[in-house]
């Protein structure tokens, strides 16, 4: 299977070997600022000469051996961010969060599918644990849509810059700057799943920072039906007594917002009880709305 055999990490000598390989790479290349740990082969021939008569607990011992290696690496290189790649298929768990800064949720980076993946994944892990990259998958969708979907988590890019037009490149640069500015809400704030893609033809997710002075709403139109009823999205987690400036961000160069409530001021109470009209009848469209307390 994949012309690979899985190393027996229940064996301490194998643990030493694996740690040594990674340690040598990082020692010889002190400029390494980030690396990912991939998991590409299942165990298809489970057996360990080291375990002898304890084969029944081999799966557990194997995983504990992996954690031991990861702990040693993290202890020696605490400042090097690590991604647990190939994270789908039950490879993500809370113990691994001790050693990895993020998970790769799935190799499926189609932005439409990612909305569902990220919605489900967020039931268990925070946005800062979910690596989400803009790629060339599903070029029927715009670079804006792909970027706006990835920005809902830990934003990254796996795309050739030569594929982007000047406007698309400028948009991505603007989106990155906005994402960095909104990190207190997206990465460290409270998440509210407002409109489920599993129950509607749209999706909406909101993040609010701890001080309730900054919030960001991600809204997506997936496949709306003809003349379906579009409902306002009622926000959550705001301070009802605060006044918030509502502004659409991440607009393509040369375009203007068509969001009717753009650059208007509302109380948190209004936004949570009445809401914002962010959805449209268009397919695969997105809006990112920033809310700033005044």
Predicted features along the sequence, with ranges:
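Active-site neighborhood of glycoside hydrolase catalytic domains
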Residues: 1-144, 154-159, 163-166
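A general structural signal for short secondary-structure junctions and capping/turn motifs
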Residues: 25, 73-74, 206-210, 235-237, ...
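Residue-level detector of short, conserved catalytic/binding motifs and their immediate flanks
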Residues: 80, 148, 215, 244, ...
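Catalytic cores of secreted or luminal carbohydrate-active enzymes
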Residues: 144-195
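Hydrophobic, well-ordered secondary-structure elements that form the walls
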Residues: 38, 82, 150, 217, ...
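Structural motif
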Residues: 137-147, 207-212
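C-terminal beta-sandwich/jelly-roll accessory domains of carbohydrate-active enzymes
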Residues: 223-294
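Carbohydrate-binding surface patches
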Residues: 196-240
């Amino acid at each position: 299977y994949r012309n690979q055999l899985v190393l027996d990490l229940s064996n301490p000598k194998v643990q030493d070997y694996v740690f040594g390989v990674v340690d040598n790479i990082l020692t010889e290349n002190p400029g390494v600022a980030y690396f990912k740990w991939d998991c590409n082969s299942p165990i298809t021939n489970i057996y360990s000469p080291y375990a002898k008569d304890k084969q029944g607990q081999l799966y557990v011992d194997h995983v504990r051996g992996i954690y031991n290696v990861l702990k040693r690496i993290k202890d020696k290189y605490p400042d090097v961010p690590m991604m647990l790649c190939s994270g789908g298929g039950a490879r993500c768990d809370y113990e691994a969060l001790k050693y990895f800064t993020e998970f790769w949720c799935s190799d499926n980076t189609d932005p439409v599918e990612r909305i569902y993946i990220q919605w489900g994944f967020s039931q268990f892990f925070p946005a800062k644990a979910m690596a989400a990259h803009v790629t060339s998958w599903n070029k029927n969708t715009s670079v804006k849509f792909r970027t706006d979907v990835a920005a809902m988590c830990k934003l990254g890019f796996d795309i050739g810059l030569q594929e982007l037009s000047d406007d698309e490149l400028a948009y991505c640069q603007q989106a990155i700057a906005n994402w960095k500015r909104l990190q207190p809400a997206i990465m460290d704030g409270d998440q509210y799943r407002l409109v489920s893609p599993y129950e509607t033809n749209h999706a909406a997710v909101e993040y609010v920072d701890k001080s309730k002075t900054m919030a960001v709403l991600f809204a997506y139109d997936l496949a709306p039906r003809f003349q379906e009823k579009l409902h306002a999205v009622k926000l959550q987690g705001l301070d009802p007594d605060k006044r918030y400036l509502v502004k659409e961000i991440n607009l393509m160069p040369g375009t203007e917002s068509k969001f009717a409530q753009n650059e208007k001021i509302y109380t948190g109470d209004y936004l949570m009880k009445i809401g914002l009209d962010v959805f449209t009848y268009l397919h695969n469209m997105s809006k990112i709305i920033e809310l700033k307390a005044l």
